[in-house]
Amino acid sequence: MKFKKLGLVMTTVFAGAALVTLSGCSSSDSASKDIITMKGDTIRVSDLYKEAKQFPSQPTNTLLQNLTFDKIFTKDFGKEVTDKDVSKKVKSIKDQYGSQFSSALQQQGLTEASFTPYMRTQMLEQAAIDHEIKETQYTDANLKKAWESYHPDVTAYVVSETSKDAATKALDAAKKDDAGKASFEKTNAESKVTFNSTSTSVPTEVQTAAFKLKNGEFSDVIESTSSSTGATSYYIVEMVKTSEKGTDMNKYKKELQNVIKTEKEQDTTFVSGVIAKYLKKNNVTVKESAFASLFSQFTQTSSSSSSK
């Protein structure tokens, strides 16, 4: 199992050199050597060693990136991401994984003790991304674009089968007569769901077919292949209650903003641009040559995007 990693914070890019390659690190006075400087703060060798003890399985680049991000995002969003908020999030994830929590942490090179500061950094980055989305992306043009493909809530039976033959037989039986339809609905009562075009639990192909149906109508057999598992499923949809979005976009403004938010959170170029913005704002400078390219994945992506 893997915990969701926001943006590009927890990258697994190894530094070209390990901790021991830092020039002068073997001397007794090296602890105060600057690795990264920024407005009002500094990351020294001693900070890196401390971070390495807490996250022994993380590569050096990741340690330095997260130390930097924690500092720069705390300046703007530290009051938004409180200890109470972090504890609540940690508890939620722990409850979600249950008895598998410890093993899931181990797979990520984390412990219960280190997971809290890890999650805090994740939440700080998310706060920065959300702020940028709110300030720059909820434009009329973006809302209108999201509106074009948006469909409001519908309620339907969404039934999946592992073979096309099984799905075809189930569909034929359901469409045969009223008794067949009633049997289909009773058998698949737990498959009655409400969803809209932003739902992630219903495949896109199924949504497209469902939104064309009138109340009481059945779809043809719909084939959908999971991008994560590669498995193909065959779906049948019976529409219970459809809906029309009408012409009033403002009625669904919140939903459309969520569409934009989800899209931008998954846009690595946008996320890199947000990080690059705060790196520049805080005048983050890498002093140690071994880590000269530490933030290039963010700044280069941002520059490439802005030049288009």
Swiss-Prot record:
Membrane topology: Lipid-anchor
Lipidation (S-diacylglycerol cysteine): 25
EC number per UniProt: 5.2.1.8
Lipid sites, type N-palmitoyl cysteine: 25
A GO biological-process term: protein folding
Catalysed transformations (reactions): [protein]-peptidylproline (omega=180) = [protein]-peptidylproline (omega=0)
Keyword terms, alphabetized: Cell membrane, Isomerase, Lipoprotein, Membrane, Palmitate, Rotamase, Signal
Annotated GO CC locations: plasma membrane
Keyword Cell inner membrane assigned: no
GO molecular function: peptidyl-prolyl cis-trans isomerase activity
InterPro entries, sorted: Foldase_PrsA, PrsA_foldase, Trigger_fact/SurA_dom_sf
Signal peptide: 1-24
Subcellular location as annotated: Cell membrane
Principal cellular location given in the protein's record: membrane
Coiled coil start-end: none
Similarity remark: Belongs to the PrsA family.
HAMAP family hit by this protein: Foldase_PrsA
Further facts: The conserved PPIase motif is absent in this protein but it still has foldase activity.
Protein role: Plays a major role in protein secretion by helping the post-translocational extracellular folding of several secreted proteins.
Name by which UniProt lists this protein: Foldase protein PrsA
The species this protein was found in: Lactococcus lactis subsp. lactis (strain IL1403)
Organismal lineage: Bacteria, Bacillati, Bacillota, Bacilli, Lactobacillales
